[in-house]
């Protein structure tokens, strides 16, 4: 047994399929199962991906039997020749497959309306002797819960995410809850930050990073930094109490830089603040090409506050629709504070909103000058007693999509700060 794993309650995830190994399909099953295991408080130390190869699959199954109490597999339960999971599991422990007549009837019933049914479909009714069946209400491939040797159980689920999730919720998860009653409750809370880098955040929490319970894990996405606080205790309420003082300390250190907790998004926060104040917003975009509008419209409740916007990508639209004087564009360039200001004031007038945001920039890979490099973005926010110009240089090394995303995050976050300060 591997020395770094406590086999008492450890769970391992194995996702099967060459399409996963080659990167053709995102391995969303592993992510979802890992979150589920954390939620029910079972330790999960290892994930693997293996292609549709029986020898490699066999080796990983045997290795898992020596180091983990439970192996959860997804994929390889279908009717095609490369679906090898069940027969390889049986082979690993020298157990014969037997035909399950109930499963066979279920497969025939589900395939009755199909014009062509292959004999391969019926191999899904061949299961290891003694295995508990996990019914599949949506597909033809049943799952199994099987304990082939002492202290080792295999839970096999389909690779189709919808089928896998349903079978986990209805059968696999309840089985784990019953068979691992002594597990501790694991609770996590995520704090989200904008306007600071991951390195800055880490430098200012060095004294907290060594905490064992709760643990603090920083990780970054484009324009945002997150801190996940995770505590383990006998009960969920005890775990939450362990997190509270750390959360208070972090909010004390970073203040308004923390914009949300858990699954809340920046656009949800902004829309909530606008809605609370009964205020509206309109947008004038150039380099972001409607991405800021998409951030609003992709959020429930946006119709209450977001009236509309214009993508003024061409200078003629800036001039003829938004009312930006052509002389101003010629003098300062489309990517400039004066032009961004006129764009914001123009859209404010057109839609008669309380707030407006304008964005103009150079997202690349062309269009830069000596004084205006790729990554230069001008943002202007207009609102009640607010006329604020923001210039950002996101870096010429960034991809076009990254500059667009960073511009959207920066604009939303600055609007959030204005709204909070006026509350």
Swiss-Prot record:
Transmembrane segments: none annotated. Disulfide bonds: none annotated. It holds the Pfam family CinA_KH. InterPro entries: CinA, CinA-like_C, CinA_C, CinA_KH, Competence-induced_CinA, MoaB/Mog-like_dom_sf, MoaB/Mog_dom. Belongs to the CinA family. NCBIfam families: cinA_nterm (TIGR00200), PncC_domain (TIGR00199), PRK00549.1 (NF001813). This is CinA-like protein.
């Amino acid at each position: 047994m591997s020395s770094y794993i406590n086999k008492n309650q450890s769970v391992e995830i194995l996702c099967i399929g060459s399409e996963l190994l080659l990167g053709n399909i995102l391995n969303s099953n592993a992510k979802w199962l890992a979150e589920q295991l954390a939620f029910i408080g079972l330790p999960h130390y290892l994930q693997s991906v293996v292609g549709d190869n029986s020898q490699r699959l066999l080796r990983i199954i045997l290795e898992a039997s020596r180091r983990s109490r439970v192996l959860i597999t997804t994929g390889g339960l279908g009717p095609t020749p490369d679906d090898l999971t069940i027969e390889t599991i049986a082979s690993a422990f020298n157990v014969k497959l037997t035909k399950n007549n109930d499963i066979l009837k279920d497969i025939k019933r589900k395939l009755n309306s199909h014009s062509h049914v292959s004999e391969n479909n019926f191999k899904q009714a061949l299961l290891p002797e003694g295995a508990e069946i996990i019914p599949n209400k949506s597909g033809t491939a049943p799952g199994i819960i099987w304990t082939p040797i002492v202290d080792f159980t295999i839970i096999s689920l389909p690779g189709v995410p919808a089928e896998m999730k349903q079978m986990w919720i209805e059968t696999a998860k309840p089985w784990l809850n019953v068979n691992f009653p002594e597990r501790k409750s694991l609770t996590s809370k995520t704090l989200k930050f904008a306007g600071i880098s991951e390195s800055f955040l880490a430098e200012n929490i060095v004294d907290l990073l060594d905490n064992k319970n709760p643990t603090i894990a920083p990780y970054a996405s484009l324009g945002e930094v997150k801190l996940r606080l995770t505590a383990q205790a006998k009960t969920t309420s005890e775990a939450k109490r362990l997190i509270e003082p750390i959360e208070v300390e972090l909010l004390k250190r970073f203040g308004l830089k923390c914009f949300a907790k858990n699954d809340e998004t920046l656009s949800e926060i902004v829309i909530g603040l606008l809605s609370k104040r009964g205020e509206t917003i309109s947008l004038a975009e150039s380099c972001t090409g409607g991405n800021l509008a998409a951030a609003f419209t992709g959020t429930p409740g946006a119709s209450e506050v977001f009236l509309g916007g214009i993508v003024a990508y061409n200078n003629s639209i800036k001039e003829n629709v938004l009312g930006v004087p052509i002389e101003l564009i010629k003098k300062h360039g489309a990517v400039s504070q004066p032009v961004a200001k006129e764009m914001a004031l123009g859209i404010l007038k057109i839609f008669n909103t309380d707030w407006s945001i304008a964005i103009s920039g150079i997202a690349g890979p062309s269009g830069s000058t000596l004084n205006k490099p790729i990554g230069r973005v001008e943002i202007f926010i207009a609102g009640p007693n607010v006329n604020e110009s923001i210039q950002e240089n996101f870096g010429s090394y960034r991809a076009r999509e990254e500059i667009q995303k960073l511009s959207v995050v920066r604009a939303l976050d600055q609007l959030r700060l204005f709204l909070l300060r006026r509350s």
